Amino acid sequence: MTRGNARELAIHLIFGREFTGETPSEVVRMRLEEGYYEQLAAEYEIYTERPTEKQVKYLENIVAGVVEHQEELNEIVGKFSIGWDVKRISRLNRVIMQLAAYEILYVDDVPEGVAVSEAVRLAKKYDDEMGKFVNGILGSFVRSLKENPAEEAPAVEEV
């Protein structure tokens, strides 16, 4: 499974968790159960390849990180979505931008440009019209970090 596919899977997990309220660990483990995962493979290509144990750890870390920082990430999305109330942004696009903002702030081995490009790719995959919107918000966020580097949050070590 590529990192891009793992990122898309993380989007599905975070999105689904918003409806169930499960802990990040629960949502990852439950969605990766044999029967459930195989059932999803019939609908989504990314589920045709099972993640390795290392990739499961990555998914757990990224889902937990986004959930832990969700309020901060929503504030970022809100700050840069000028003229939009965060609640009016579709839940899926909000989750896509939360994940990208989390990677930009807290994941050292993901360059900012990759996080933005992947978010745009995922937004377009699910809603072709949202690519520019997501790019605009995340691009403004990245530019603000370059203009005010003291505002950037410290990186969290990966486990």
What do the PLM-derived regions correspond to, one by one?
Residues 1-159:
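N-terminal interaction/assembly modules
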